[in-house]
């Protein structure tokens, strides 16, 4: 974020923004940064307190996921959402200062925008509808090229409908 940012909370509040941030612990470090017993409990409590602080700014930590063995360089992913991108950025910094993450390396950080669906206004992310987070997270970006917008709107609607139906039979996935 730069100091001359012109985004206001009212403008940013029109959409949801999400961040997916992956952290890796140092190679060869035993356990999680050498934390054991009471130290691990203190570190977890400190992290929970930081999560509560960022919640006061309008940022929700949707989940903390174990991604070890899923990515070459990554052990834990933090998924957050909010309506102001700068608040998400500040929340990442706040969480990184906790003992649980301070010795890690941020190996991936991506911000995305969840906007109103083009053809189905009722299609909103599960978190925006108040659904409880699940144990596993599966996501992918639906990136649209310039050519996408050259297609006839009816064809785009058909393709999106077909695309959305692909996951309907998967009971563990909330679309």
How should these model regions be labeled?
Residues 173-175:
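Conserved small/polar residues in nucleotide/adenosyl-binding loops
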Residues 95-103:
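A common structural junction motif
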Residues 47-88, 92:
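Long, hydrophobic/aromatic-enriched structural stretches that serve as scaffold segments
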């Amino acid at each position: 974020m730069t100091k001359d940012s012109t985004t206001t909370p009212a403008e940013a509040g029109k959409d949801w923004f999400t961040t997916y941030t992956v952290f890796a612990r140092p190679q060869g470090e035993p356990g999680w940064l050498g934390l054991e017993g009471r130290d691990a409990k203190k570190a977890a409590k400190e992290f929970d307190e930081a999560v509560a602080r960022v919640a006061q700014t309008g940022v929700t930590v949707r989940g903390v996921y174990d991604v070890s063995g899923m990515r070459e360089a990554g052990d834990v992913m933090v998924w957050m959402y909010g309506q102001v991108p700068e608040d998400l950025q500040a929340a990442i910094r706040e969480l990184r200062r906790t003992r649980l993450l301070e010795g890690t390396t941020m190996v991936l950080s991506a911000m995305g925008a969840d906007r109103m669906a083009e053809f189905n206004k009722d299609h909103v992310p599960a978190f925006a509808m108040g659904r409880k987070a699940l144990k596993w997270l599966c996501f992918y970006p639906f990136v649209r090229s310039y050519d996408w917008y050259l297609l006839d709107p009816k064809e785009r609607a058909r393709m999106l409908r077909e695309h959305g139906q692909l996951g309907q039979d998967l009971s563990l996935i909330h679309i």
